[in-house]
Amino acid sequence: MNLRPLHDRVIVKRLDQETKTASGIVIPDAAAEKPDQGEVLAVGPGKRDDKGAPIALDVKVGDRVLFGKYAGQTVKVDGNELLVMREEDIMAVVNK
């Protein structure tokens, strides 16, 4: 991937959502909602404080994160659909 996010932006790849419910019902692609979880692929250097020093981001590459359904901007890179979002659009990091 040849993307380097700027400032406090993060590149996220959506994780595939289950296509079957717990009771075994198969959910067709047309009815399935976009997943709200993803894996962080790249992070920017962070915002700058009043003195110009960078403020590091709380998320790092490889983190599994939760975000809003409409968070970020969708981009296609090398045939992969990715999200570019600000760190503030990420609601939580999922602990493994």
UniProtKB/Swiss-Prot annotation:
This is Co-chaperonin GroES. One of its GO terms (molecular function) is protein-folding chaperone binding. Disulfide bonds: none annotated. It comes from the Bacteria. SUPFAM superfamilies: GroES-like (SSF50129). One of its GO terms (cellular component) is cytoplasm. It comes from Paraburkholderia phymatum (strain DSM 17167 / CIP 108236 / LMG 21445 / STM815). The lineage of its organism: Bacteria, Pseudomonadati, Pseudomonadota, Betaproteobacteria, Burkholderiales. It is found in: Cytoplasm.
